[in-house]
Amino acid sequence: MSRQSSITVTVRVRPFSTAESANLIASSDRLSFGTSSSLRNPGSGRQIRRVVKVLDGRVLVFDPPDETTATLSATNRRLSTSQQSLARLSRKSNNSAGFGRDLRYAFDRVFDETATQQQVYERTARPLLDNILDGFNATIFAYGATGCGKTHTISGTMQDPGLIYLTLKELFERMDHLRDEKIFDLRLSYLEIYNETIRDLLVSPTPNQAKPLNLREDADRRITVPGLTSLSPESLEEIIDIIMKGNANRTMSPTEANAASSRSHAVLQVTLIQKPRTAGINEDHTLATLSIIDLAGSERATATKLRGSRLFEGANINKSLLALGNCINALCDPHRRAHVPYRDSKLTRLLKFSLGGNCRTVMIVCVSPSSVHYEETHNTLKYANRAKNIKTEVLRNMISVDRHVSQYVKAIVELREQISELENRLAQIDLSSQSNGSDQDAVTQSFAHESKLAEARNLLRMTFEETLPLQNDTINKVEKVKHFDDSIRVLKYWLSCYERILPNSADERVFLVRSKLESLLTRRAEIIADIDPELVYQKFQRSVSHIINTYKQEGATMYADVLQDEVDLLKSIIENQVLDAQNKVDEFTPVLESLLRSSFKASSLLKEGGMQELFSILEKWLLGIGLGEKPNISVLSESYKLNSTSDDSRTINRDRVHSFPTQPLLNNNLPRMFFVKSPKKPVVFSKRSPKKRVRFDDSMSTSDSGASAYNSPIQTSKLKNMNFFNTMHMPSTPAHKRPENKNQIDVEINLTSPVSPMLEDKPEPGLLIKSPLEKKQEVNSESTQLDQLLAEDSSTDDVSLPHLDTIDLDGSPVPKVPDLNFSRANMDSPTFILNNEAIHNFDFSKPKTRQSLSSLTTLHLSNPANIIRKSLSMAENEEEKAT
């Protein structure tokens, strides 16, 4: 908000001093031709006349014509010709000295000798207080020759205080009146410009004077003084003490023209920061600066009779005032063609924004009516007349401060407390109005306000209900944007992992994933463009704006504030809902990232280990995830099957079967890949080879059901958070590094089992147990015991990989699909638990046993370590019995 403003120029004419009154010409009839020489030399000190005459409150006359002019003209007509010539010559000489110029000047306000300090304050500084409280900068400075009353106008005395005291007194009174609505922060600084150096007046001078301060321009292009003392007074008494301390430190010395001459320019700056107590989410702080400047007076060396350092001080004072006059001349140009020399002096740099910037400025011109200061008064009036043409662009200083999210709840609580306090006040007003029967009009008006307030609350409630669909739509859009962010995050992670771990593979599909990512970003931007909660806020405000305006017109500002607080409370509720939607925690994305991380690590290990089939299947599954497809879990289950169409070249060499390493290579805390369960696939015990090996192969199927390993899916672990890295088997220890132990039975679970001697062309997954025992031992047991074992139905847990059918990267959530159950395919198949007791009672020689085992579909081991130990003990016992 900007306003065009002009500098307000006022003129104050001081009264004659005692010495000047003694030499003042009392009446004009004392003048004669013989005394005209004293008038031609107005500074002679003997005869003094008035050179400034105030006509009214806005116009004054400089060097008015004397009242005896008409009398002299009439007298000249009675003189002889030679005497008339002498009189004309005398008047001509007087006019050349400035006698009777009759120059008229008009200003915003003119004060004569009888004006008091209070009158000057009422017409100059008091109007600026409204601007200060509204956030506009203001400046008051006194300008004039030495001894013309500038310091008296600005500072005054204890009996007759000046503008500083009167201005700050009323400022504190207004602040106390507004403390219920606003929070104020007032800071005060006081400095002087002495011989073009800046001194801090609030710091007592010391023998080792500190380094002078410098002027700086901040980021907002405001002139500041780094290192200047800034105080925060809490009362008017503290301000008076501060001003008196600063005036005591100011440089002053007597001269011939003024007994208490100021030898420096004094600048008092008052900075006021204010903020409303009921500020919304975005707080607006108002900042305003009031500058009160007492300039040193211009002086002539011949009049002041200065020598030495005082002469040097006067030269610097005149230099700075000359720079100020040049700036005024340049600013008066309506086209601003001339450069404004602000940097010619520190005074003009300090007054830069007061003269031509963001500030309301009042210039108080102090002049002397005595002819002793004839030339100084004339020049001062000329500069003041030019300063009227200076235009300034005034802007309100607002500082926007965003509140933290944690302050929303606090703001709501404060608003509710204020509403309760206002309601209590209203209740007290109602009680007092009812008790005082004489004030019936106030009671009636209060009831009318209450009814309007109830009506406004109903309107707000209806508006809130009407905007519920719009509120829900906004919140849904915010949640959708949050879901898009999660999907974009997963896709970016997928791309980074895929390009790093699987380079140069499926470039076309990677391009499709990038296209999908760009599509998600575009759709997200479109949704964000449609989110506009301000529509809801505007509906709330418009629904009760007419009632608020009515309250303000009737002077019921309290009711207007209560209603506005309720509107702000509704806005805060909507904003909190939007923030909750933005900060909603989604547990799906971290789980999916963890799954992708494990899958990519597993694919890298599979590729390095030469397991090309598993690598291809896992790569296919990862590509499906990146393209947003819904991959079936059977894709991963294929990794546990062997290709039934493989040729003889894929037969595994029996001599290359290795045992487990003596020390586990993986962490024992990691989840196991398989649980030991009852068998559900046919198991055939083949004849022992010459190397005394025992083979359990589920590839032989001789049962009537004809169940095959190719027709039933392989069960896997049921761990929900299983990743492929934890399920990979590390390579076994080489044969030449293994310790020789004749009593050790090595067990190794292979994804591709060795070829059965009964079925050479059909490799199947199975369990290979090899023993280095020299002699084959057979276990004698009854077939009935084995039949009982085969009839037992051990409870097995259904296991499945984590479901990935719920993964959808299209930007919309998908309902969870129930877990697959692969145990139903073999529900009717008998189960068999191969544990210690079963091995002890097992008879491999009976055909019935083979027939029963061939009908099984799956072989589960309860504990392989126990089986190994039990087998060793059984073999040793049988060998002892045989010997």
Swiss-Prot record:
Keywords: ATP-binding, Cell cycle, Cell division, Centromere, Chromosome, Chromosome partition, Coiled coil, Cytoplasm, Cytoskeleton, Kinetochore, Microtubule, Mitosis, Motor protein, Nucleotide-binding. It is found in: Cytoplasm; Cytoplasm, Cytoskeleton; Chromosome, Centromere, Kinetochore; Cytoplasm, Cytoskeleton, Spindle. Has a role in establishing metaphase during mitosis. Required for chromosome segregation where it generates tension during kinetochore capturing. The lineage of its organism: Eukaryota, Fungi, Dikarya, Ascomycota, Taphrinomycotina. Residues 396-435, 563-588 form a coiled coil. Heterodimer with klp6. Residues 6-390 form the Kinesin motor domain. SUPFAM superfamilies: P-loop containing nucleoside triphosphate hydrolases. GO terms for biological process: cell division; deactivation of mitotic spindle assembly checkpoint; lateral attachment of mitotic spindle microtubules to kinetochore; microtubule cytoskeleton organization; microtubule depolymerization; microtubule-based movement; mitotic chromosome movement towards spindle pole; mitotic metaphase chromosome recapture. It comes from the Eukaryota. GO terms for molecular function: ATP binding; ATP hydrolysis activity; microtubule binding; plus-end-directed microtubule motor activity. ATP binds at G144, A145, T146, G147, C148, G149, K150, T151. Disruption phenotype: Simultaneous disruption of dam1 is lethal and leads to the cut phenotype (septation without chromosome segregation). GO terms for cellular component: cortical microtubule; cytoplasm; cytosol; kinesin complex; kinesin I complex; kinetochore; microtubule cytoskeleton; mitotic spindle. Its main location: cytoplasm. Pfam families: Kinesin (PF00225). Belongs to the TRAFAC class myosin-kinesin ATPase superfamily. Kinesin family. Kinesin II subfamily. This is Kinesin-like protein 5. Residues 755-785 are annotated as: Disordered. The gene is klp5. Signal peptide: none annotated.
